Amino acid sequence: MAKILLANGCSHVAGSESPISFVKPLSEKMGMESVNLALPGGGNDRIVRTTINHCLTNKVDFVVVGWTTYERQEVIFNEEWHHFGLGRQVPDNVNNKEQLQKLFDFMSLYCCNWNTLGLERTLIQQLTLKSFLENRGIDYLFFNAWNKFYEDVQHPAFPELLNDKYYKPFNAIFEDYEELMPEHYSELHHGNEHVHKAIAEELYEQISRTTKQRT
């Protein structure tokens, strides 16, 4: 039976505006088949929820998560999941669109404090998923796809996350590559296949290093 690499994140992990996501070449290098749950516009709430649910009901051998920006949240409206982000406009096909837009506007004003609420939520989400995966014996690699930590972070959860399975916590990988390869990025800051192949190589090297250190 093939081993399964499960990936999750936002548009960067999904491979928006690129023919491929880094997930496919990474899984091929690891000799695995891939499942990519990433959703453009999705936040860290969704990453944790869908990763845990998938691992509870499916065989998973390795998890790669590219964390996204702090302010994104999930809400249930008309029995459906909707994904909030700063300035997000509700799609026209949503019933009672005006009511959901009022909620999003309220959240933009009062629920997006990056330095307290956003940071708190993100760290607890990451620690929750880390603990879940380790409890089930599933190997993993975390990295920041977009939005990085600063070195003066003061929170009791933060030291618990700092190991070789959280790659470059003080960097945001897709932001770094935009500085290195700006000609391969769209106006919406999405990398093309050249970026994704380079990131696949970098993540594979990190996974290989950490695997050798543990054997």
PLM ranges: what are they?
Residues M1-R46, T50-N53, T57, N192, ...:
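Serine-esterase "nucleophile elbow" of acetyl-processing enzymes
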Residues I52-T215:
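Alpha-helical cap/lid subdomain in secreted, periplasmic
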